[in-house]
From Swiss-Prot:
Description of how the protein assembles with itself and partners: Homodimer.
Protein name per Swiss-Prot or TrEMBL: Acyl-coenzyme A thioesterase THEM5
Organism: Mus musculus
Subcellular location: Mitochondrion matrix
InterPro entries on file: HotDog_dom_sf, Thioestr_dom
Entry keyword annotation includes Mitochondrion: yes
Top-rank taxon: Eukaryota
Phenotype of the disrupted gene, per the record: With increasing age, mice develop fatty liver, due to impaired mitochondrial fatty acid metabolism, and impaired remodeling of the mitochondrial lipid cardiolipin. Mitochondria contain increased levels of monolysocardiolipin, and decreased levels of linoleic and linolenic acid. The altered fatty acid metabolism leads to decreased mitochondrial beta-oxidation and ketone body formation. Mitochondria show abnormal, elongated morphology, and their function is impaired.
Single GO MF annotation: long-chain fatty acyl-CoA hydrolase activity
Record field: catalytic activity: hexadecanoyl-CoA + H2O = hexadecanoate + CoA + H(+); (9Z,12Z)-octadecadienoyl-CoA + H2O = (9Z,12Z)-octadecadienoate + CoA + H(+); tetradecanoyl-CoA + H2O = tetradecanoate + CoA + H(+); (9Z)-octadecenoyl-CoA + H2O = (9Z)-octadecenoate + CoA + H(+)
Protein family per UniProt: Belongs to the THEM4/THEM5 thioesterase family.
Length: 248
């Protein structure tokens, strides 16, 4: 009964994530709009020198599975295939020098902006995750260890916490793979609960890019692939970020 109700509550349609989607989808001339290469997007997104804190680094709370699989993927980055993505406290830090189009940037004097999945600052208590991206294959792997502050059913991660991280990983992958910026839809089917403090591996793939949209899929499962936690699909709108003016 718990599983049935869990699956019923978990249906998400038109979930908005990285930024809220505008009501009207702008039409653009595709031949000229999306000229940024994956390499240039990755270079901007992953600065080599920065004073910003990277939250996607190992800490004492990581379980042995999380640590060992992290090391495996870190080794794969040396061959030039995979890239470890840094994770700063806000997406504003990832897109420095750029602004949202159509005046969507909000004006505020608040300084402590935080990405939802980086809002819990205590190590091991909330989201512990790291994303690896493969540019040529347009896919990502996210290693996720939910902490006790993400609990839903006693001892297990809330379904919404997984949904949020799926959307976050989708958004990063969509942007780097094809300048995908807004979540148009996110559909999830939950299969099993994730124990708090354990590792879940999210495999995300760009299925196709068509008609100004990126179509993507994700499966969240245990490291040995014997337990599937959830499957999802997402659609993202391609929308090019604008250069900020020198006066800003």
């Amino acid at each position: 009964m718990l599983r049935t109700s869990f699956q019923g509550v978990a249906r998400l349609v038109r979930h908005k994530a990285l930024y809220r989607s505008p009501c009207l989808l702008p039409r653009v001339h595709l031949a000229s709009a999306f000229g940024s290469s994956t390499e240039s997007l990755v270079a901007r997104f992953c600065p080599e020198k920065t004073d910003l804190k990277d939250y996607a680094l190992p800490n004492a709370s990581w379980c042995s599975d999380m640590l060992s699989l992290y090391q495996e993927f870190l080794e794969k980055t040396k061959s030039g295939g995979w890239i470890k993505l840094p994770s700063f406290k806000s997406n504003r830090d990832h897109i420095q020098g750029l602004k949202l189009p159509f005046g969507l940037e909000t004006a505020s004097d608040k300084q402590d902006w935080r990405l939802f999945t980086r809002s819990i600052q205590l190590e091991g208590q909330g989201y512990e995750y790291v994303i690896f991206f493969h540019p040529s294959e347009k896919k990502s792997v996210c290693l996720f260890q939910p902490g006790p502050y993400l609990e839903g059913a006693p001892g297990f991660a809330h379904g919404g916490s997984l949904a949020a991280l799926m959307d976050e990983t989708y958004s990063k992958t969509a942007y780097l793979a094809g300048e995908g910026l807004f979540t148009l839809s996110l559909n999830i089917k939950f299969k099993n609960l994730i124990p708090v403090g354990s590792l879940a591996v999210l495999d995300i793939q760009v299925e196709k890019i068509e008609d100004q949209k990126l179509y993507m899929s994700c499966i969240a499962q245990s490291r040995d692939k014997q337990t599937v936690y959830a499957k999802s699909s997402g659609v993202f709108l391609q929308l090019q970020l604008e250069e900020q003016s020198q006066e800003q």
